[in-house]
């Protein structure tokens, strides 16, 4: 083998290795799910149609709990528009409440959300037209609690999802979201996507160039998704970030607090 051919071969092999290291076929977010039951939290299955409502949650994420908080804890106003019938129970959308003697009991689980690399767009995508990760789990283990159907179609329609993570800012990252349910997203603890209320499919895009971030720094990325109504559950997320996780809890959840171990890990 001549030197030129050997050089070409080595260059090809090195580029292949570097490419594969830089762009793994999949990346996995270990997320926290909270199974909800409308009989315990009446903010679920309010039996209404509505529209997108912005301004339901505070524009700055609570740095201690790392979950959204309502702007108002009173009935009426935006809470009525967003079909938050009991504001005091909103805190348990994305936090565990496993005491059956108290209101808003839920079932926390951990779940792996696997993103697939799209080489044509150089992004990672999670796309699920029927995002029902806890069918016949949680409260729905009991057939008597499968009370909210879409006609004759069964799913466990009532659950919320929380992703607490971080990324190293490279200077041009973006996020695309498509969903027919509530989504709130925060970068650097600031609200960047505000899709509250009971609404139909909506697409949103975050361009991080507009957020005043510094290249090379690590920033928190927190995403909250909640399905409160029957019919469907669509979720598409497209990202092009360098994902990092400062620490994982003993459930394997990034920045978790161990609470999702109560219900176990969903395969």
Swiss-Prot record:
All residue ranges annotated as the PA14 domain in the record: 116-257
Organism: Dictyostelium discoideum
Keywords, ordered alphabetically: Glycoprotein, Secreted, Signal
Annotated PROSITE patterns: PA14
Residues glycosylated per entry: 47, 62, 99
Subcellular location: Secreted
Major location (coarse): secreted
Protein family according to the UniProt entry: Belongs to the prespore-cell-inducing factor family.
Protein name, per record: Protein psiS
One cellular component (GO) term of this entry: extracellular region
InterPro entries linked to this entry: Fibro_Slime, PA14/GLEYA, PA14_dom, Prespore-cell_inducing_factor
Disulfide bonds: none
Region forming the signal peptide: 1-22
């Amino acid at each position: 083998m001549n030197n030129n051919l050997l050089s070409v071969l080595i260059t090809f092999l090195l580029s292949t290795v570097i490419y594969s290291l830089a762009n793994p076929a999949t990346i996995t977010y270990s997320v926290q799910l909270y199974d909800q039951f409308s009989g315990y939290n009446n903010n679920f299955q309010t039996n209404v149609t509505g529209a997108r409502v912005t301004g339901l949650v505070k524009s700055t994420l609570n740095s201690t709990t790392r979950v959204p908080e309502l702007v108002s804890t009173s009935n009426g106003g935006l809470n009525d528009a967003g079909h938050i019938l009991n504001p005091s129970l909103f805190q348990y959308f994305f936090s565990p409440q496993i005491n059956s003697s108290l209101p808003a009991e839920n079932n926390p689980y951990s779940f792996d959300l696997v993103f697939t690399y799209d080489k044509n767009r150089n992004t990672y995508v999670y796309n699920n037209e029927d995002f029902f990760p806890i069918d016949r789990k949680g409260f729905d283990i009991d057939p008597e609690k499968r009370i909210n159907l879409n006609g004759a179609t069964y799913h466990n329609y009532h659950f919320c999802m929380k992703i607490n993570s971080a990324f190293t800012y490279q200077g041009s990252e973006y996020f695309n979201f498509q969903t027919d349910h509530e989504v709130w997203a925060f970068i650097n603890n600031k609200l960047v996507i505000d899709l509250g209320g009971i609404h139909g499919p909506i697409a949103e895009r975050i361009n991080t160039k507009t957020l005043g971030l510094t290249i090379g720094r690590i920033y928190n990325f927190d995403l909250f998704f909640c399905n409160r109504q029957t019919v469907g559950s669509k979720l598409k997320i497209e990202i092009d970030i360098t994902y990092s996780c400062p620490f994982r809890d003993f459930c394997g959840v990034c920045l978790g607090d161990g609470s999702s171990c109560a219900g176990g890990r969903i395969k």
